[in-house]
Amino acid sequence: MDQRVNRQVRLKSRPSGIPKAEHFEIVEAPVPDPSNGQVLVRNIYLSVDPAMRGWVSAVANYSEPVALGAVMRSLAVGRVEESRSSDFHPGEYVTGMFGWQDYAVVDAAAIEREVGGSGLPISTSLGVLGLNGLTAYFALLEIGQPKAGETAVVSTAAGAVGSCVGQIAEIKGCRTVAIAGG
């Protein structure tokens, strides 16, 4: 019998302002078993992003709200513990929407990618080499196509994407104007 416990952070109530600890609950659940085509991942790093404020709201925006009683949605980096998919093997490090929990069973197709082969810390897959960093990189360099000496104005420069855009613009030789706050 599996003695492991899956600690999960679940959304208990919807905040009307800034989320606080009282809006969440920690639940101990059994570690789930993967079915065919699925992978059991043990989370190592969880992402905490500004977008989560919208996810705990009752109002749908670009994605559905997290349901009350559900595990908090989150990108994570984890280690494959068990695999019922030929695409992933135990010991590999992967990233995906695994949630705030110790273990997640996910469809192999929902795993974004294998990480850890670059020699950089695997946590960078949630930051500069993850969704936010790649969004900044491609938005600025492929769409913006800045040239040295130009001025780059970065709104929301204190955010995850904006802070990366500002740094990339500086590297490219731009005069960077960062806007943060009201």
Regions found by a protein language model. Give the residues of each.
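Gly/Ala-rich phosphate-binding loop of Rossmann-like dinucleotide-binding domains
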Residues: 136, 166, 170
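NAD(P)H dinucleotide-binding glycine-rich loop of Rossmann-like/cofactor-binding domains
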Residues: 72-79, 90-156
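Adenosine-nucleotide cofactor-binding segment
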Residues: 170-182
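Short glycine/threonine/proline-enriched tight-turn/helix- or strand-capping micro-motif at secondary-structure
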Residues: 19-30, 59
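Short structural boundary motif marking the start of a folded domain
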Residues: 2-9
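Glycine-rich beta-strand-centered segment in the early N-terminal region that forms part
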Residues: 30-48, 56-100
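Short N-terminal binding/cap micro-motifs at the start of the first secondary-structure element
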Residues: 15-21, 50
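N-terminal Rossmann-fold NAD(P) dinucleotide-binding loop
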Residues: 162-163
